[in-house]
Amino acid sequence: MMNWQQLLSDRRVGAETRQGGGGDYARSEFERDYDRLVFSPPFRRLQNKTQVFPLPGNVFVHNRLTHSLEVSCVGRSLGNMVGTALQRKYPDLGIDFRSSLSAIVSAACLAHDMGNPPFGHSGERAIGAYFTEGNGLQWREAVEAEGHRWSDFTHFEGNANALRLLTHQFLGRRAGGFALSYSTIASIIKYPYSSECAGGHGKFGFFQTEEATMRDLAEELGLIRLSGDDEPLRYARYPLVYLVEASDDICYQVMDIEDAYKLNILSYEEAKNILSAFLDESERVYMEDLFRDITDANERIGYLRSRAINALVEETAQIFIEHEEQILSGVFSGGLLSKLSEPRNSAMKHCSQVAWDRIYRSKMVIDMELAGHRIFTSLLDKLLHALAHPEHLYSKALLDRVSSQYNVHETSCYGRIQCALDYISGMTDLY
């Protein structure tokens, strides 16, 4: 069983033996993680990356940056609630445990989408399709002949790419990437297994190049290994991942409804009914009374959204505490939100169904997905040809455009593909 004393580690990736720098008495190590992320260029670039809807014209909807900030706020609240309960249960954890846990979850929430390519989740699908059924298939034999994992590309995953972005030493950069704490890094790894375990769902947590980093994290934090010596690497989740995942799910499920209302995809009555379904009967009665004074429709939807999130956060924290032993033992299955009680369980399922039927399959979202597929295909065709044939005149001009932190002189086919994906996934929708 995992234990909290070992799970909270301020050891930094890539800085394990580094000396000097002095202490920072104004901030904890985990608060430094948060600040380091906020001040980083990759985090700022999230403002020009799509969340669900195309980047706005006259109506401002969520992008990756605003979504990540909101997820971080929810994560902070969940961390505080869970940390308080655990500190009460285990007094030996110390007075800083609650604040440390909250800071870790909040920082991880900021970072959870930093590995996602442009055009939302459709960008991930476009990259996977390129190597599954597109022109990228031509490189499969070479990658496998090198002993590398082709599945790293056919199942391209933003979560695995975030781990690479945050920990890999790119050219001219320091060891350990962002040099974040082990606990913060572990909190973003939703799928702690290799792409060989991805199967039909296509999810995994680390590329072959980051497998050693995953092993180091697991050893330092005491994660439970689920795979045998001769099997693809697989671990039980780091416990705080459940809080990061829940924060993300709460925000995108609820906020997508508000955005859809603002874009007139959902009517006021539809949005109101979806959001109010998360509330208990007594709170719905109070809400109707309050709405006699609040006549602005946008204000009403905003209020309902905040109450729905609050109700979900409070119950999610309780679910974590109730299942803490299963989580620490590595046997908890599903996400925390799958254990919601009524009426929130039915409300969440209905919210997800409406989102799929009316939002994710809406014309504007489908048009963006088609555009992303076309753009990614063109970019990958040109970049991979240039990387394979750098002596060509056009190739040299194209590779000169690639940031110097990416190694365009990679000799392996796997390395060249990773170079192209590092560059493309760091782009914004507008780039």
Regions found by a protein language model. Name each.
Residues 1-26, 38-49, 58, 69, ...:
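Sequence-structural signature of the catalytic-core scaffold of metal-dependent phosphohydrolases
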Residues 1-23, 377-386, 394, 398-431:
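Acidic, carboxylate-rich catalytic segments that either coordinate divalent cations
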Residues 31-44, 340-346:
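Acidic, low-complexity proline/glycine-rich segments
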Residues 49-59, 354-359:
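A short small-residue
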Residues 62-65:
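Low-complexity, highly charged intrinsically disordered N-terminal segments
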Residues 80, 167, 252-255, 259, ...:
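Charged/polar positions within long, soluble alpha-helices
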Residues 124, 128, 132, 314, ...:
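Amphipathic alpha-helical core segments of compact helical bundles
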